[in-house]
From Swiss-Prot:
Pathway: Amino-acid biosynthesis; L-histidine biosynthesis; L-histidine from 5-phospho-alpha-D-ribose 1-diphosphate: step 4/9. It holds the Pfam family His_biosynth. Gene3D superfamilies: Aldolase class I. One of its GO terms (cellular component) is cytoplasm. It is found in: Cytoplasm. This is 1-(5-phosphoribosyl)-5-[(5-phosphoribosylamino)methylideneamino] imidazole-4-carboxamide isomerase. It comes from Legionella pneumophila (strain Corby). It is an enzyme of class 5 (isomerase). Belongs to the HisA/HisF family. The lineage of its organism: Bacteria, Pseudomonadati, Pseudomonadota, Gammaproteobacteria, Legionellales. Disulfide bonds: none annotated.
């Protein structure tokens, strides 16, 4: 299983949101490039970077900073406001390893398909963030500010027809809470779509959570707030 550190950016700083709420932001003193270099030295194989300003505004705001983070040598999967072919191509040309497409996959399927065809499916990660309502995982969009009526299963089934294999799924209720991930959700995801390389995010607390997710068939975990805790060794998580 791949262990991927997450770096969320807001106004050029490293931050974390609680349950995706922009009014519950924790800002960290470390600078993003220093944070990326730190993970590079510890042996990280990939970084997950989110431009929260872009996710909220609908247009990526911090591509220059993300490109600077790439100079650490770690492949980056990045998203937050990629909502046009032009911006997708700009990110790809800048060397971003995989583009993370979120809200657009729900709000504009035609444009998303065009991006997939231009960039190639293997270079895309669909980020599908859900709120579980009466056991049905419904998707949230626009930096989690709005809810959609589309279910996770409907959207995955649709894009699978276009070659998408990499999907990052977050249960918003777990994100930033450090109470554990939604194991039932990920178990269902792997059972319904075993051919998808699922990435799990939200609520992961310790090595046992990661081990359990691996036993369910999850391909990668995204670690955010957990890696800011003093008692967590990223090097040990890689072992």
């Amino acid at each position: 299983m791949l262990v991927i550190p997450a770096i969320d950016l807001q106004s050029g700083r490293c931050v974390r949101l609680k349950q995706g709420r922009f009014d519950q932001v924790t800002q960290f003193s470390v600078f993003p490039i220093e944070r990326a270099l730190h993970f590079a030295k510890l042996g990280a194989k990939r970084l997950h970077v989110v431009d929260l300003d872009g996710a909220r505004s609908g247009k990526m705001q911090q591509l220059e900073l993300i490109c600077s983070m790439q100079k650490t040598g770690i492949p980056i999967q990045a998203g937050g406001g990629i909502r046009s072919i032009e911006q997708a191509l700009e990110c790809s040309s800048a060397g971003i390893s995989q583009l993370v497409i979120g809200s657009l996959a729900i709000t504009n399927t035609d444009l998303t398909i065009q991006i997939i065809e231009k960039i190639k499916p293997e270079n895309i990660v669909l980020a599908l963030d859900v709120r579980v309502d009466t056991k049905v995982p419904l998707l949230a969009i626009n930096g989690w500010q709005n809810n959609s009526t589309s279910s996770l299963w409907e959207v995955v089934s649709y894009y699978e027809n276009y070659g998408i294999k990499n999907i990052l799924c977050t249960d918003i209720a777990c994100d930033g809470m450090m109470n554990g991930p939604n194991f039932d959700l990920y178990q269902q995801a792997v059972e319904y779509f075993p051919q998808i390389a699922w990435q799990a995010s939200g609520g992961i607390r310790h090595m046992q959570d990661i081990t359990t997710l691996g036993s369910l068939g999850i391909s990668a975990v995204i670690l955010g707030l957990m890696l800011y805790q003093d008692n967590v060794s990223f090097e040990e998580l890689l072992c």
